[in-house]
Amino acid sequence: LLSAPAAAEKRKVEPLLLSMPLYNQHDYAEPVFAWNEQEVTVEESGCGAACVAMVVGYFEPDDAPEPDDVMSLAGELGLYRGDGLGRDALRLLLDEYGVEGRWRKMDAQAIENTLRKGYPIVEYVGAGYFTENGHYVVLRGITEDGKLLVADPNSEEKTTQKTYRFAAMIQQGKGDYPFMICEKEDASGETAQKGSAQRSAKRK
């Protein structure tokens, strides 16, 4: 017999896909700026910048920055500290593009509800599927078998060919508040959802 959590993982749900640009940080190997006489690139330390670019691209598909644009802005604002971008830096960068980011602790139901409202979620993950240390990814959809679609700026395969259990993503969250809910208001004060929330997210 399946345990309750295992049965929940196998439930059929309405699939969801938040349409956003899927940036790979390895496509951005050129130096963006220098920090303490060291060249800074998106490829080496720009997973956070890539995630910000993906989220902004979801809300503003016709005016989306690329990861090197976001990293350059981080340098201009003094948000880079030598080993990538901190969580507050990501929140401040999103704010520069008119997107509100709020770091939270979330359970599986909260994650699903948030995605179904059309809000992408940036997650800071620790050791596990994506990294041995710290790394940023974007939760971008749900499959019909109840798993998460994740945009990993460090791996095209993990972005396009893999799906992930809610429980595993929650377990691998790093810190007390590893999830950042991303929202944007339009001119009327309503929450903007300019990226399409497509009802198809099937994966083999």
Q: Where does each model-flagged region fall?
A:
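Active-site-adjacent structural segments surrounding the nucleophilic cysteine of cysteine proteases
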Residues: 1-79, 203
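Sec/Tat-exported extracytoplasmic proteins
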Residues: 51, 55-63, 74-78, 94-98, ...
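Extracytoplasmic/secreted envelope proteins and their assembly/folding machinery
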Residues: 44, 48-56, 67, 71, ...
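Extracytoplasmic/secreted cell-surface and envelope-processing proteins
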Residues: 82-88, 130-135, 158-161
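Active-site-adjacent substructure of cysteine-protease-like catalytic cores
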Residues: 100-155, 185
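Noncatalytic regulatory segments and standalone regulatory/sensor domains
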Residues: 9-15, 20, 24, 142-204
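Mid-length scaffold segments of soluble, non-membrane domains
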Residues: 65-106, 116
